[in-house]
A protein has these predicted regions:
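Accessory DNA-binding and partner-docking regions appended to nucleic-acid-acting proteins
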Residues: 1-6, 354-356, 386-621
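Helicase motor core with emphasis on the C-terminal RecA-like subdomain
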Residues: 1-10, 14-18, 22-34, 38-44, ...
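Solvent-exposed, amphipathic alpha-helical segments
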Residues: 22-26, 30, 361, 420, ...
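Generic alpha-helical structural context detector
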Residues: 25, 183, 311, 326-330, ...
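Short helix-to-turn junction characteristic of helix-turn-helix DNA-binding domains
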Residues: 27, 220, 271, 366, ...
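Short, charged low-complexity linear segments at domain edges
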Residues: 350-385
Length: 621
C-alpha cells in the first residue's frame, strides 16, 4: 500500500497537506527529521501514516497526557492498532495495552516522557520499533517557551534505539529553538521540514485593555453558541470573569491549577465534547485540548512571549475555518511577568536577557500599528506573505491594522504625540503613576494635581481632545518602545521618561504610534463564518448541517469520545453541501475513510435523506 492509498483508506483524504508526504517518506527511509508545521497543519499524520503501513511500531512521546486517550480513539477510528501508556491509565487498560504490545499487535503507541524513562517499557518495544516521534518537541529546548526537564533526558533513551528513525515535531519554534531541538535530541543529519507559520484563517486583533469584562463579553457575544477560550493571568481573575460571563447567560466554566482535579476534568471534558461553549482559564488549560472548531481565543491579559501567544491563539480555527484571536494589552502585564520570573531571586544574566527580549517582543506585537500576521511570521523567521500566497497589496485583510480597526499615525504626528506624552512624565519628575499623568494630559484638575501645582504646567490639558483610551494606549506603546518606563518605588509604580525618551524629545530617534478605532467600528460578527470559511465554494444547507451535528453528538456521547473523533466539522459542512445519496458518494467526502464509512455511513446517509438524528443514531456501529 502506498502512502496515498493509506491516506485515502484510513483518513479519507485524496491529497496530503504541505510537507506531510515528504516527512512520511523521510521516516520510512529511516531518516531523522524535524517537522515544524502550524497548528492544523497535520503534524500527527506524519507519524501516524508510517504506523498505518504496518511496517513496524511507531512510538510517540508526548507531554499531553490529558489528550492521549482521545488521540488513541481517533487513531483507532482511522483503523490503526493504537494504544497509550501513561500514569492516568486504569490498571486493566494498562494490562491489556501491555498484552497487545507483547503480542506484536500494536502499531502506534503513545507514551509520556515520564513513562518512557521508567525503563521497563524499552524491552517490549525494541524489536519492532521503526520510528520514535517526539511531539511538542519545543519542550526539550533550553530556549523554548515551555522547558520540561523530563523532555531534556530523552536523548539518553533515544540512544538505545540506534536503528529507529527519530522525528521531532512542533508547531512553535524560532530558528534558535529549531537548532536546539536538533541538538538536544541528537538528531542525526536531520531533514528539516519547516512549514510557514502563518495561519491565514485567523483574524488577529490587539487592543488596549480598558474594561476587561466588557471587552471579553463583546467578543463572546459575537460568537453565540460557538466554542471559545478566554485566557486570564491570575486564578482570581479567572473566577471573577467566569462568574461575570455566567451571569450574562454564557455557557462557561473556570479552569486553573488551584481547582479540584475533578472539577478541572469535568470542565475540560464538557468543552471537548461541546457541552460547554467557553472556558475561562489560566495557561494551565489548553495543552490537552483537541477541539478543532474553537471559533475564538481571547487573551484578557498579555502572555509572556510571542511563542506562548502563537501556541495559545493557535488553538482557534484548527478546522480551517475563520476564527478570531483577540489580545487585550496593558503594560502592567509585562511588569507582572517580570516580577513573577524574579520572585525566587535574580535570574542568571543569560535568562534575564532572554526574559527581557521576550517581553519586548510580545509588547511590540501588541502595540505596533503593523500587520499582525507579518509580525508573527517574521518573528519565526519566515517571509510574509508566504511564497505563492494571494494578497491584496500589503493588506492581510485579517488583522485589526489591515482592517482599519487600528489606525497608524503619520511619522510626524507620532513624533509630536510622543513628545506631548513624554513631557507629561518629564514635567512631573517621574514621581507619579500612569493615572496621574493621564489626568494631567487630559486637563483633569483633581485635588492632587491642584495641590502639587501641576494644573498650572504648560502640559496640563495638552491632549484633552484625545480621550483617555488613546492617551493610556500611547503610554503603553511608549513603554514598549523604551522611551517611558514604570519603576517601583515603595511598592508604587511610577511613570518615568528614559534617556531614550529624552533623546526623542530632542528629535533624536523615531517612534511609531497607533490608535484603536471605537468599539462599535471593530470586529463585527460575520454571517456564519464557520460555514463560509470551511466551504467557500459550496452552499451548505444550514439546517442539515445542524442535524448532522446533532447526530454526531449522539454518536460521540454513546461512544464516550469527543465529536471530532467521529467527524470534523469540515466533513459535515461538505456533507450538508453535497448531500450524497450513496455510500460511494459519501466516501468522496474529505475525511470519510473506510472504517468511518463502515461504522457511520448508514446513519449519516439516513439523516441526509431526512431521517431524524435520534432515530438514525441507532444505525451506527
Amino acid at each position: 500500500m502506498t502512502p496515498e492509498e493509506a491516506l485515502q483508506r484510513h483518513w479519507g483524504y485524496g491529497t496530503f497537506k504541505p510537507l506531510q508526504r515528504e516527512a512520511v517518506e523521510a521516516a520510512l527511509a529511516g531518516r531523522d527529521c524535524l517537522v515544524v508545521l502550524p497548528t492544523g497543519g497535520g503534524k500527527s499524520l506524519c507519524y501516524q501514516l508510517p504506523a498505518a503501513l504496518g511496517r513496524g511500531l511507531v512510538l510517540v512521546v508526548s507531554p499531553l497526557i490529558a489528550l492521549m486517550d482521545d488521540q488513541v480513539a481517533a487513531a483507532r477510528e482511522a483503523g490503526l492498532a493504537a494504544d497509550a501508556l501513561h500514569s492516568n491509565l486504569e490498571a486493566d487498560h494498562r494490562s491489556e495495552a501491555y498484552r497487545r504490545l507483547a503480542a506484536g499487535q500494536t502499531d502506534l503507541l503513545y507514551v509520556s516522557p515520564e513513562r518512557l524513562l521508567v525503563g521497563d517499557l524499552l524491552e517490549d518495544v525494541a524489536g519492532r520499533l521503526i520510528l520514535i516521534a517526539v511531539d511538542e518537541a519545543h519542550c526539550v529546548s533550553h530556549w523554548g517557551h515551555e522547558v520540561r526537564p523530563k523532555y531534556r533526558r530523552l536523548a539518553e533513551i533515544l540512544e538505545r534505539f540506534p536503528k529507529a528513525a527519530r522525528m521531532a515535531l512542533t508547531a512553535t519554534a524560532t530558528p534558535a529553538v529549531q537548532e536546539d531541538v536538533c541538538a538536544q535530541l541528537a538528531l542525526r543529519g536531520p531533514v528539516r521540514f519547516i512549514g510557514h507559520p502563518d495561519r491565514p484563517n485567523l483574524v488577529y486583533r490587539a487592543f488596549p485593555r480598558r474594561d476587561q469584562s466588557a471587552q471579553v463579553l463583546e467578543v463572546v457575544r459575537r460568537h453565540p453558541g460557538e466554542g471559545g477560550i478566554v485566557y486570564v493571568q491570575t486564578r482570581k481573575d479567572v473566577e471573577r470573569l467566569a462568574a461575570k460571563l455566567e451571569g450574562e447567560g454564557v455557557s462557561c466554566a473556570a479552569y486553573h491549577a488551584g481547582l479540584p482535579a475533578e472539577r478541572r476534568r469535568r470542565a475540560q471534558d464538557d468543552f471537548v465534547h461541546e457541552r460547554l461553549d467557553v472556558v475561562v482559564a489560566t495557561i494551565a488549560f489548553g495543552m490537552g485540548i483537541d477541539r478543532s472548531n474553537v471559533r475564538y481565543v481571547v487573551h484578557a491579559n498579555t502572555p509572556r512571549s510571542v511563542e506562548h501567544y502563537q501556541q495559545e491563539s493557535g488553538r482557534a480555527g484548527r478546522d480551517g475555518g475563520p476564527a478570531d484571536c483577540v489580545l487585550l494589552f496593558a503594560a502592567s502585564d509585562l511588569a507582572l511577568h517580570r516580577a513573577l520570573a524574579l520572585k525566587d531571586g535574580a535570574l542568571a544574566p543569560e535568562r534575564q536577557r532572554a526574559l527581557e527580549r521576550q517581553l519586548r517582543e510580545i509588547g511590540r506585537y501588541a502595540v505596533a500599528p503593523v500587520c499582525r500576521h507579518r509580525l508573527l511570521a517574521e518573528h519565526f523567521g519566515a517571509p510574509y506573505p508566504a511564497e505563492g500566497a494571494s494578497r491584496d497589496g500589503e493588506s492581510c485583510a485579517a488583522c485589526d491594522v489591515c482592517l482599519g480597526e487600528t489606525k497608524s499615525l503619520s511619522a510626524e504626528d507620532a513624533l509630536l504625540t510622543a513628545k506631548q506624552v513624554l513631557s507629561g512624565a518629564w514635567r512631573t519628575g517621574g514621581r507619579f503613576g500612569t493615572g496621574y499623568v493621564v489626568n494631567l494630559l487630559l486637563g483633569r484638575g483633581d485635588e492632587r494635581l491642584t495641590r502639587n501645582g501641576h494644573d498650572s504646567l504648560q502640559v496640563f490639558g495638552l491632549l484633552k481632545g484625545s480621550g483617555e483610551a488613546a492617551v493610556r494606549s500611547w503610554i503603553d506603546q511608549l513603554i514598549v518602545q523604551g522611551v517611558l518606563e514604570v519603576s517601583e518605588q515603595r511598592e508604587y509604580p511610577l511613570l518615568r521618561i528614559t534617556e531614550a525618551g529624552k533623546a526623542l524629545c530632542r528629535d533624536e530617534g523615531t517612534v511609531r504610534l497607533g490608535v484603536p478605532a471605537p468599539p462599535a467600528a471593530r470586529g463585527r460578527k460575520r454571517p456564519k463564518a464557520l460555514r463560509k470559511g470551511l466551504a467557500s465554494e459550496m452552499s451548505p444547507d444550514e439546517e442539515l448541517f445542524e442535524r448532522l451535528r446533532q447526530l454526531r453528538r449522539l454518536i460521540s456521547e454513546r461512544l464516550g469520545v469527543p465529536p471530532y473523533v467521529v467527524f470534523h466539522d469540515s466533513a459535515l459542512v461538505e456533507m450538508s453541501a453535497l448531500k450524497p445519496k450513496t455510500r460511494e458518494a459519501l466516501r468522496g467526502v474529505k475525511g470519510v475513510g473506510d472504517r468511518k464509512l463502515e461504522r457511520y455511513g448508514t446513519a449519516f446517509l439516513d439523516v441526509i435523506s431526512g431521517r431524524p438524528p435520534e432515530s438514525a443514531a441507532s444505525r451506527s456501529s
